[in-house]
Amino acid sequence: MTEMVPAWVEGRLMPVEKLEAHQRGLRHMAISVFVMAGEAVLIQRRAAGKYHTPGLWANTCCTHPRWGEEAADCAVRRLREELGITGLVTVFADRVEYRADVGNGLTEHEVVDIFVAEAPSDLPVNPDPEEVWETRWVDLTDLAREVKEHPERFTPWLRIYLAEHMERIFGKLRVVQ
């Protein structure tokens, strides 16, 4: 199935096939979700079959809205599709932009709406194996330390979020050094 995502081509937002957006390094819309249980965040290891950054740890979920889809609706959809998570209230945290090489000649140049959702630590999670290899809860401070010590284990966008946008995403109470 061809997935059309909102991307800027010559300064105009228009539908572009997702893989083409990455091949051309086009600036495009995305969403990222962080599900939190207190100070712990649910992270996922991307499935081995993903066409970029397979096997790397990422935030709870992320994707690109379909052409015409609202970012908030997309966040809820991907929690359900990737992780089988329903019933959480996602709250818009911020919008950030980044550009990163994700290997195999592909570039993520994303304008990302970031959402945070609070959940119980015993939240039922049922990952789609086509999308997610495994999940785990990790304390945000420990995650920030792991990313600094072993950046090669994590997606470029998670490294960027934690290095450059902690306060904007998690608020002053959750900022770690």
Curated annotation (Swiss-Prot):
Q: What CDD domains would the database entry show?
A: NUDIX_IPP_Isomerase (cd02885)
Which sites bind Mn(2+)?
H22, H28, H64, E108, E110
**Pfam families recorded for this chain?**
NUDIX
Chief place of localization:
cytoplasm
EC main group: isomerase
Location relative to the cell: Cytoplasm
User: Which residues take part in binding Mg(2+)?
Assistant: C62, E82
Which residues are the signal sequence here?
Answer: none
Q: What cellular-component terms does GO give this entry?
A: cytoplasm
Its Enzyme Commission number? 5.3.3.2
Q: Name one GO molecular function term.
A: isopentenyl-diphosphate delta-isomerase activity
* Annotated ranges, domain Nudix hydrolase: 26-160
- Please give the catalytic activity noted in the UniProt record: isopentenyl diphosphate = dimethylallyl diphosphate
Q: How many cofactors are bound and how?
A: Binds 1 Mg(2+) ion per subunit. The magnesium ion binds only when substrate is bound.
Magnesium among keywords: yes
Q: Where is the active site?
A: C62, E110
**Sorted UniProt keywords:** Chlorophyll biosynthesis, Cytoplasm, Isomerase, Isoprene biosynthesis, Magnesium, Manganese, Metal-binding, Photosynthesis
User: What does the record give as its pathway?
Assistant: Isoprenoid biosynthesis; dimethylallyl diphosphate biosynthesis; dimethylallyl diphosphate from isopentenyl diphosphate: step 1/1; Porphyrin-containing compound metabolism; chlorophyll biosynthesis
**Gene Ontology BP, a term:** photosynthesis
Q: Which cofactor does it need?
A: Mg(2+); Mn(2+)
Tell me which domain of life the UniProt entry assigns to the organism this sequence originates from: Bacteria
Relate the protein's function as given in its record: Catalyzes the 1,3-allylic rearrangement of the homoallylic substrate isopentenyl (IPP) to its highly electrophilic allylic isomer, dimethylallyl diphosphate (DMAPP).
The family line of this record is: Belongs to the IPP isomerase type 1 family.
Name under which the protein is recorded: Isopentenyl-diphosphate Delta-isomerase
- Organism equals Cereibacter sphaeroides (strain ATCC 17023 / DSM 158 / JCM 6121 / CCUG 31486 / LMG 2827 / NBRC 12203 / NCIMB 8253 / ATH 2.4.1.)
Name the gene. idi
